[in-house]
Amino acid sequence: MKTNHINILLLMAVLFGFSACSDDDELNAVSVFEDVTQVEKNEFDNWLEDNYRKVYNIDFKYRYSDKESDLSYHVIPADFEKSKALAILVKHVWLEAYSEAVSTDFMKTYVPRIIQLTGSYKWNGNGSQVLGTAEGGLKVMLYGVNELDIDNPRINTSNPYESHQVKPIDMNYWFFHTMHHEFCHILTQKKEYDPQFRSICAATYHSTDWINMDDKKVAKEGFVTSYASSEYNEDFAEIYATYITNTPEGWQLILNEAGEEGTVILNQKLDLMKEYFRSSWDIDLDHMRDIVLRRSQESVSLDLRTLK
């Protein structure tokens, strides 16, 4: 009997709570959650239609979506204004770099069909931070969008060992390195790279303890980052993303840390990677790097608050 009275009281409290919501409550007109019903398009939605969907066949999702998210992690929605800024940056620095180096049709064919933004990062059980993921070449998830400083965009291309805690955040590390890395995975899933690459460091990968490794230390073993030392597919993608987002001087800093033995290994891997992109995709990696670096420099002068 006591239970029934409690249930009735709880029901009344819930109903009262709903009725107490005032019509005068001020809410942002733009929802950060994706509704199952058709939402009215705003200016940003129309811009994405013209610059992403029509040109590259990409559905750029900035509203939080349960079906696009991994519900086993606690994350928050991406900020609306920062989503706009990142969409402008991704278009200029990433999409148009490949369009310039290869073609727009190439990107339209191979880019993921969905780019989903999330405001916060997600963390694995081993303490590692997930910056982005690619799912079968169909979707790329980008995390930590709310860390972007719209008025002080910064892309570090000269020091691969800069602290990741520096503010404003380095968009290369937190976004573009990740996007190049994940796109490399997509391409290698379409066309396999030389299996010789796998054997170069077969005995030295840190499959279970890479998170405890130091970037400078693993350079001596022939890895550009600690994550590269986790396994050969990540190794390949990390070399690619690191090479094209760093100046020759930045790459040389890695070789300096690698020493003679590590440099031999890194150059061996780099040669195989360059040949793969040249023969499989007709991409000259040094030309690609020049374009990426130029567009990275241009990004700091972009108006990230105005859709054009």
Where are these regions (language model features)?
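Metalloprotease/metallohydrolase-associated module, dominated by Zn2+-dependent proteases
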Residues: 204-308
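Active-site recognition of the HExxH zinc-binding catalytic motif
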Residues: 142, 156-194, 237
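C-terminal motif of bacterial Sec signal peptides marking the signal peptidase cleavage site
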Residues: 16-20
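Acidic/polar, low-complexity intrinsically disordered N-terminal segments immediately downstream
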Residues: 5, 22-108, 261-308
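Acidic, glycine-rich loop-and-strand cores that form catalytic or ligand-binding grooves
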Residues: 176-218
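Second-shell loop/turn segments in exported
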Residues: 72-80, 147-150, 161-170, 174, ...
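Auxiliary, metal-adjacent structural segments of Zn-dependent hydrolase domains
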Residues: 26, 84-149
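Bacterial N-terminal signal peptides that target proteins for export
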Residues: 1-9
